[in-house]
Amino acid sequence: MAALNMVRKGLFGELLHATCGYEHDLRDVKFNDGKHYTYQKGGELRMGKDAFAEAQWRTNHSVRRNGDVYPTHGIGPVANCLDINRGNRFLSLSAMATQSRGLHKFIVDNGGENHPLAKVRFNLGDIVTSMIKCANGQTVIVTHDTNSPRPYSLGFRIQGTEGLWMNDGDHVYVENQSKPHRWDDSEEWFKKFDHTLWSKHEAEAAQAGHGGMDYVMMFDLINAIHNKKPAPMDCYDAAAWSAISALSEMSI
């Protein structure tokens, strides 16, 4: 939200480019037996109706599909920064996928080559990259990466004619304010540009899920309904963000 505030106040100049995605090691989630995570002693590899929670349905997407199966998590905040459906729009998309290796390797490493799931043919590329062109000229790169060993990241980068912010490493650079060719730590910038919604409700939000995001999003929606204002996200946003999934499959 602080980064959005920086954009709104013109800190980065005219926006040129953004990156985002869903980069989250979900291999254990995709084969969860409901009793143990598979890397723990005694865990079993399961998927489908005999599995637990997301492993009942999520893993099947990796079998049937090859595209960005979850673009909305990352593209939402970027779309807000780029004024998508509010003076700007997505124009075109081109996507590509790597080979599919991670899930099969995970099964073999944890269950052996003779495990029944080792026969499953996974279609989803381990890393799917979609490039989007916007009507106002900007480009966006969206990455889906859930079958690889890695720390969690949404890969945010917002870049303009006068600077940029990257969430990996918490970096900010602003021309004529940062030291030349040296990153600033984002903490001081975030304090300066803290969003009023966050600063006002930070204490309450801290008790909610996903680092406070759940609280802020629900508060913003309920506040809009209560005051009869436009919702912060609407059905047109949902359609634009979700279309990336189907279009990436068509492109690949």
What are these regions (language model features)?
Residues 26-28, 148-151, 166:
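Short glycine/serine/proline-enriched coil/turn segments at secondary-structure junctions
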Residues 1-121, 221:
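Predominantly a Rossmann-like dinucleotide-binding segment in NAD(P)-dependent oxidoreductases
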